[in-house]
Amino acid sequence: MTVTEPATQRGFPLLPSRLSRGSKATRTTDNTAAALLLTFTVVAILWANSPWAHTYSALLDTHVGFSFGSHHAEMTVKHVVNDALMTFFFFIVGLEVTREFTIGELTDRSRAAVPVVAAAAGLILPAVVFLAFNPSGENAHAWGVVISTDTAFLVGALAIIKPKFPARVRLFLLTLAVVDDVGALIAIAVLYSDNIQVAPLVVAVALLGALALVRYLPKARGPAYAVLGAALWIALYLAGIHPTLAGVAVALLIPVFTPERAPVERAVQQIRAFRQSPNSRYARAASRSLRDSISINERLQTAVSPVVSFVILPLFALVNAGVLLDGPSLTAALRSPLTWGIVAGLVVGKFVGIAGATWLIRRTGLGVLAPGLTLRRIAGGAALSGIGFTISLFIVDIAIDDPSRQDQARIGVLAASVLAFALGWAIFRITDWLSPPEPVGLKLLRPIDPERDHVRGRPDAPLTLVEYGDFECPFCSRVTGAIDEVRAHFGDDLLYVWRHFPLERAHPRAFDAARASEAAALQGRFWEMTHELFTHQDDLEWSDMYRYAVAAGCDIEQFDQDVRVHSSKVLHRVSDDAEDADAMDLNATPTLFVNGKRHRGPWDAASLIRALEAGRG
């Protein structure tokens, strides 16, 4: 049987996917983007309310365009940003949605069930609340303003509030944000497009067919996507459908896949050839091999996302957030059911919808929360989900024609965002005060569960020893010998637990080895596979691990299926342990917990025996 290496799916930490579990550098980038968005929002508000407000209006109404023969095209600066540049924002959203449903967090349907249902409730209930304030008339058409959460501000708000152990709630909210974006995009496509022109629409459909075939081109796929995408934008614009949806359509048709061993090995060979004989031909070949080993979806996210985060979204905030906040405008907003409908929809509707749906699906047993994620954490995150900005202001511009009512709606969006932040901050602070978490890392965060954890010994043993380690760590290998002595000393009085904490920066094969051990565990061969991995921890290529699986007594066909085809079974099991370690601020392996408390000191058998004996009393 020919075996290919299953690609590591843990996050791609340097990529901009919002579900990435990546590094602190990635989170810093997210926070910087949110800060920049906030800065441009404040600048727009100050500018629109300054003595130079006329220059702000003049800038937005400035026409830009070009001529080609007898044809002339022009748009205002505001429409260039909202209709043209924002296409790239929706393009990135589409790429992320495609990736998450294909190879990301949403491939595990049971894991995604709770945030997906919560997101659906967070889309529907805010609209219902808004329509209770605006049941008819022109205002009712603006119900879409309250359905979306601004992901950039959501991430920034979590960074500012700094709730205890935020990793789980952050992942939950980012998963929810993906579904939230899908709902908003559908609303824009179906309900905020009118006066459809048939001929351009037919052209748009034909272009979509051509885009679907681009993946089969032997080369020049990038330029083909760009040219056909631009043509699709024009066709949708002429058809009367909001042209930014061209970005989503193109993104959904771009293939995404996990890196496979064969193209990666070809890239390594090309790099080795270039290292031995540097020349332009080898340089081009190496560059092309590296590029082809990663899906175009991933490459485009890496290339386009920084431009969207640091240029397009700040420009969008600048041209859309400049609402007049003088006395008459605020008075009109305070008396407007449009404003109050938006505030209530975003603040109350989002909170009740997300928190209520989470409670209900958990209570009925239709879904489960990830380890370490509590309902009170969900409540704080649900409140922050009322921060609506980017898509909310976007829909304000296309759903409302009257400038004065647009200002009332924008005031509602801004007020709701401030209130949602304050409510989220209060919930996190109050729950932390009423039920203060344990000091980070001093006590075991997640209790031992013999049904879930990998354990050796009696489940009701009076003494427990939990190890967070990785299979490439030489110290973990040495501790394994010491723990064998400790187990022999205590016999049935000791329950030993292994949990995964692969330190990928120091040990690049540790995560893959952990996945292999979990695939073996599905066949009841975890400890046998653990022995093989520690015995050969200097040789942890995937081809080696298949040999170790055979030596451990695994059915190799089933092992291959579990690590390649059904990889989410093992991926999330490893990630759960690693995220618990991250939540406890662990930073080294092995990390040991003796009777639930962090062990500080030597790892030799005698020291561990003394620590366990001290815990008997």
Swiss-Prot record:
Presence of the UniProt keyword Cytoplasm in the record: no
Region (Na(+)/H(+) antiporter NhaA) location: 1-433
Record's bilayer topology term: Multi-pass membrane protein
Compartments in which it is found: Cell membrane
Entry keyword set: Antiport, Cell membrane, Ion transport, Membrane, Sodium, Sodium transport, Transmembrane, Transmembrane helix, Transport
GO molecular function: oxidoreductase activity; sodium:proton antiporter activity
Limits of the Thioredoxin domain: 434-617
Keyword Signal: no
Location of region: Disordered: 1-26
Record-level GO cellular component terms: plasma membrane
Catalytic activity entry: Na(+)(in) + 2 H(+)(out) = Na(+)(out) + 2 H(+)(in)
Transmembrane segments: 33-53, 75-95, 113-133, 141-161, 171-191, 198-218, 234-254, 304-324, 341-361, 378-398, 411-431
Xref: InterPro entries: Na/H_antiporter_dom_sf (IPR023171), NhaA (IPR004670), Thioredoxin-like_fold (IPR012336), Thioredoxin-like_sf (IPR036249), Thioredoxin_domain (IPR013766)
Family in the record: In the N-terminal section; belongs to the NhaA Na(+)/H(+) (TC 2.A.33) antiporter family.
Task performed by this protein: Na(+)/H(+) antiporter that extrudes sodium in exchange for external protons.
Protein name from the UniProt record: Na(+)/H(+) antiporter NhaA 1
Organism: Mycolicibacterium gilvum (strain PYR-GCK) (Mycobacterium gilvum (strain PYR-GCK))
Gene: nhaA1
